């Protein structure tokens, strides 16, 4: 398997777009999205044809600009139907891609690159990504890409992944949020503390709308981000409350709990795949952040981490 930045991560979608809140998000039905839709005068959305429990309606790929030459953000998962859809969409509108901007390395965003290069060899030197792989060009924070009708500014926004980029289209004061902020539910993250700091950075751009990598358009991006931050802070409090109760009630005031136990107590009986691929990694990340804040710690018991509250509240 190719490492970070590679294109053979196609089947690694299980922990890259998962809902954090299973009960509040996963059980809701998702609104249908059109395969191809002009969502603004400057932005055309093309679905990646990879719908699923974790990818929602599929990966959103975006054709940006109003002239013959345009930009493309993300390439989907490598589904042949997406390549056909992109090809017909570009041909029908006499569009020529001048550059491809990848939001991050995950396979449901980079998987379509080989198809693009097969269809459009002129793009071989025009695939851009932060921390680029061989043959790719770098994207730096603040870098600007321009085509007719679109001035797109890159924003380094780690959290969901180390190399994650968002993009601001200045003509609309809108932001392509990648997987940091989704149209429905909440994305999984690599490092919670970094992601939360990044959300505040994203808010500082004061963009109106958000164009996420999964889900429908976000009409009020800053309000959505505020909700995300509040949700994570609430989860931190809940985890700490559970650990405080366990410490008080068990083992003579020295009680502790594994991640698996905390997930069961907080979320109840959930789907095993969702539990193992989304909820347990998320709670583990919450615990790591609480440890950074010196509110919890862990000990090893039979080779397994058990977490406890440092100071009872």
Swiss-Prot record:
Pathway: Secondary metabolite biosynthesis. It comes from the Eukaryota. Zn(2+) 2 binds at residues 108-109. Binds 2 Zn(2+) ions per subunit. One of its GO terms (molecular function) is hydrolase activity. It is an enzyme of class 3 (hydrolase). The active site is at 108 (proton donor/acceptor). Zn(2+) 1 binds at residues 104, 106. Induction: The cluster is expressed in rice fermentation medium. Three regulators are located in the cluster (ptaR1, ptaR2 and ptaR3), suggesting that the production of pestheic acid is controlled by a complex regulatory mechanism. It holds the Pfam family Lactamase_B. One of its GO terms (biological process) is secondary metabolite biosynthetic process. It catalyses: atrochrysone carboxyl-[ACP] + H2O = atrochrysone carboxylate + holo-[ACP] + H(+). Keywords: Hydrolase, Metal-binding, Zinc. Its cofactor is Zn(2+). Disulfide bonds: none annotated. Signal peptide: none annotated. Its EC number is 3.1.2.-. Belongs to the metallo-beta-lactamase superfamily. Lactamase-like protein; part of the gene cluster that mediates the biosynthesis of pestheic acid, a diphenyl ether which is a biosynthetic precursor of the unique chloropupukeananes. The biosynthesis initiates from condensation of acetate and malonate units catalyzed by the non-reducing PKS ptaA. As the ptaA protein is TE/CLC domain-deficient, hydrolysis and Claisen cyclization of the polyketide could be catalyzed by ptaB containing a beta-lactamase domain. This is Lactamase-like protein ptaB. The lineage of its organism: Eukaryota, Fungi, Dikarya, Ascomycota, Pezizomycotina.
